[in-house]
Amino acid sequence: MSGGYDLNLFASPPDCKFLCSVCHGVLKRPTRLPCSHIFCKKCIFRWLARQNTCPCCRKEVTRRKMVEVNKLRKTIGRLQVKCKNAAAGCLDTHPLAHRKEHQDSCPFELMACPNEGCTVQVLRGVLDEHRQHCQQNGQQRCPLGCGSTLAALEGEHHNCYRELRDAWVQRHERNRTLLLGLLGRVRRVHLTTSIIHQQLAQLSNFLEDDDNLLLNAQVQETEVTPEAEMRGTQGQSVL
């Protein structure tokens, strides 16, 4: 990868004194060696990683004596460059030093739609128009972090405090409804348990009464049997 600026970036061909002898691009962060030859900082460090001599004169290089040439860097920064979006229609030219500033505002810069769920990329100049048509499908999170999902144009009227308060009220009511439902179930279970206890008590009483009746019947039967036997014996004696 080249360490310098691509020649095609510039509005007019740069002077050869601004070119790097290693990458043949325009010098980026120009760095001068002790022998006075100047290269892109990245280019010369890559070169010196393989051999410790100047690419031009082959003199040995002492790294601690290498210096960045800030004056030359500023001169190169004033060279006029074309917008990187020239192919998309931008005809603007500006100093190299202002390249990023222009790029951040260029109407021909390709931008991703910020609406959540939308994957369309449009030019910055028509992004607002796209968002107006995209708002029914595209949504975005509240930038203040309340967690609300907003339609594209709702942000101006969005109130985080109100949204959070309403969400809290809804959650509180939902929890209250759940609690009342659980309490109702507990009451029904308690009532059912009480009825079962009553029925078990009644059944126990019935069983106890049956046991008493059975016991009394057995006692009476025991008392009657000896008397009958005695009467039978006496009758046989008389005969």
From Swiss-Prot:
It comes from the Eukaryota. InterPro entries: Znf_RING (IPR001841), Znf_RING/FYVE/PHD (IPR013083), Znf_RING_CS (IPR017907), Znf_SIAH (IPR013010), Znf_TRAF (IPR001293). Gene3D superfamilies: Zinc/RING finger domain, C3HC4 (zinc finger). It is found in: Cytoplasm; Nucleus. Disruption phenotype: Male mutants fecundity is normal. Pfam families: zf-C3HC4_2. The keyword Heme does not apply. Expressed in testis. Expressed in round spermatids of the stages VII-VIII semniniferous tubules. Expressed in elongating spermatids of stages VIII-IX seminiferous tubules (at protein level). A zinc finger (TRAF-type) spans 101-156. This is RING finger protein 151. The gene is Rnf151.
